[in-house]
Regions:
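N-terminal "leader" segments that precede or initiate the main folded domain
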Residues: 1-94, 181-189, 204-245, 392-428
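Hydrophobic, membrane-inserted alpha-helices
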Residues: 11-15, 160-164, 183-190, 206-211, ...
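Membrane-embedded catalytic interface detector for glycan/lipid assembly enzymes
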Residues: 78-219, 230-248, 418-428
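Hydrophobic alpha-helical segments
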Residues: 326-428
Length: 428
């Protein structure tokens, strides 16, 4: 094991141990982002696959620029909020459970959301004539299950699941309504599994986890590791559904990934490669890139909503996945920034993200509301998958954010004032 891996795993262990301090916030920006990236780099530097290569100095520098810029943003937010009284998490839980909701509005918003999802599902199915789960192993792909406009609305499951949890949390009684909402939400979620999509479900899970952590006593530090492993297992399970011969899957991955360890541990191949190849692809690509795309990827939602994405891509012959040496085709969030704007984008955009996310965190801790917790929960998801993709650029992500914003704005009763509770809490 290299000194880089030892250092990164040591940072991960330190973050975990600090989470057991009293009033320590396990979801603070520095902890979430630091843990995810320390783990990713530590695993990548083990070089357990022959597809991995020794990173160039340029690759290391550019990767660390992105990480350091984000952490610099969080540090500035910390300095700006020094001395500011933060509501302890125990007091936050009391305040958040006291929020008032217009029950009928939230109920019907969820029902309408399920209706929109159902109509979109049926329209695309009738247009295509197949479901992704039933065409695995063929030339058809899950990304082909799409009709312009309806393809975005099909991703409503994230806000449907979250708002159903909010309904259960804030609405007292109403057992029949809760059973009905839970039933239609589970049906929608079950049908969504057939599409072999994962990010929308992971988004719902992480935002729900954040809400339950800050608003209830259900989530404790000792449970977080099991939840993290559960989420990772879900990623792996969705990946396995794309193949017919599951009994040969582990050995297939082991062979194609050219792993260096014994075949007895072949089942570890896909989780490991899923985590590290994003960084490998980024480091390999940045040293070969000789042109930039000036916002095409960072602001992907703009070209998507206007219908220009395919036209612009074809006109300029943009290769969305260049310089690959394997079937793993993602590059981490930093790739979008570098490919669009070079080193300047890699320094500036993560800095703005780190600063913005951290300022949102301190706003949530000083003025705890369901809206603020929800907004920060979405950003926890962004940090959690930053080693993989940059979800903010996706149209489906912005659609879910708008749905959450308008749903909560319409259903929650506004509070006129908030009382600062308790002493200054642990900030990082």
């Amino acid at each position: 094991m290299s000194w880089v891996s030892l250092l990164c795993f040591g940072i991960c262990l330190g973050i975990v141990l600090f989470c057991f301090r009293r009033e320590a916030d396990i979801l603070s920006p520095g902890r979430v982002f630091g843990f995810v990236w320390s783990l990713a780099i530590g695993l990548a530097d083990l070089k357990l696959s022959r597809l991995q290569q020794t990173w160039s100095l340029e690759g290391w520098v550019l990767l660390l620029i992105g990480i350091s810029s984000f952490l610099a943003g969080t540090s500035i937010a910390y300095v700006l909020n020094l001395g500011k009284k933060l509501v302890p998490i125990s007091a936050m839980r009391r305040l958040l459970r006291q929020e008032e909701v217009v029950e009928r509005r939230l109920f019907w918003f969820i029902v309408v959301g399920v209706g929109i999802y159902t109509v979109s599902y049926l329209v695309i199915f009738l247009a295509k004539g197949w479901l992704p789960v039933f065409v695995v192993g063929t030339r058809l792909s899950r990304v082909d299950f799409y009709v312009f406009g309806f393809g975005v609305l099909l991703n409503s499951t994230a806000f449907i699941v979250f708002l159903t949890v909010v309904y259960h949390l804030l609405v007292h009684g109403r057992r029949a309504e809760k059973i009905f909402l839970t039933s239609i939400t589970l049906i929608a979620l079950g049908s969504y599994f057939l599409l072999l999509q994962r990010f929308q479900i992971i988004m719902a899970a992480i935002v729900c986890f954040t809400l339950l952590y800050y608003a209830t006593s259900y989530i404790k530090p000792r449970n977080v590791l099991f939840i993290f492993l559960g989420v990772s297992a879900f990623f792996y399970w969705i990946s396995t559904l794309r193949y017919r011969h599951l009994e040969l899957l582990s050995m297939y991955f082991y062979s194609t990934a050219k792993m260096k360890f014994s075949a007895a541990y072949a089942f570890l191949t896909e989780p490991y490669m899923y985590m590290v190849m994003n960084l490998e692809n980024f480091v390999r690509a940045v040293s070969r890139l000789d042109h930039h795309t000036y916002g095409y990827f960072t602001f992907d939602f703009l070209v998507s909503v206007t219908g220009l994405e395919k036209w612009v891509g074809q006109y300029f012959a943009i290769d969305r996945m260049p310089y690959l040496n394997s079937g793993y085709n993602t590059y981490s969030a930093f790739w979008d920034f570098y490919r669009d704007f070079g080193a300047a984008g890699l320094a500036l955009i993560p800095f703005v993200l780190g600063l913005g996310i951290s300022l949102l965190y301190y706003r949530m801790r000083s003025t705890p509301t369901i809206k603020n917790v929800t907004a920060y929960g979405v950003m926890v998801f962004v940090m959690f998958v930053s080693f993989f993709v940059f979800p903010i650029s996706f149209l489906w992500f912005l659609y879910n954010m708008l749905a959450l914003y308008w749903g909560l704005r319409w259903a929650l009763r506004p509070r006129n004032s908030y009382v600062q509770v308790g002493p200054i809490a642990e900030q990082h």
